[in-house]
């Protein structure tokens, strides 16, 4: 399954197919690696002796929703822009685009590792109808989160959501307690895949 599946059908060039497949494989590898070392707590977290271990729902770290008609939509995702508190970001800002939502926190080690990789994928796909939207959670120090983004030269927008209110929009159908996690929405903003 690749980005080309979510795009409008037009004859792809050989080069664009190579790029898209490489991006999809790279994004999957980055997200899988981050998922293995996720910064989570909650019902899926287990303490094993003196160590902490994450157990993903059903033992899965990559969840795909196919066929497209079986995909659900998240509720309204909106909140203040991390970089500009006077601006509100919304999923509606990305109409008819594939949207990669990344839930992160500057305090999360795997988030620090994956953010530069996500930026590279964003740079490679933003002109192909793919938008990225970050959701910064559990960061009560806004300036620390801003510094995190500036230091890593991240250019895609993020919602600032310390209490995780935005995650309520995902409801009980999708995992929301794993940080970092990435949710890929198709052009109709249906959940196509979740990477924990």
Walk through the language-model features, giving the residues of each.
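Short active-site neighborhood of thiol/selenol oxidoreductases, capturing the structured segment around
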Residues: 89-112, 118, 132
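Residue-level signal for well-ordered, solvent-exposed loop/turn and beta-edge residues enriched
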Residues: 3, 85-87, 190
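Structural microenvironment flanking redox-active thiols in thiol-disulfide oxidoreductases
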Residues: 112-152, 162-169
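Thiol/disulfide oxidoreductase modules built on the thioredoxin-like
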Residues: 147-155, 161-196
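N-terminal targeting signals for export/organelle localization
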Residues: 1-80
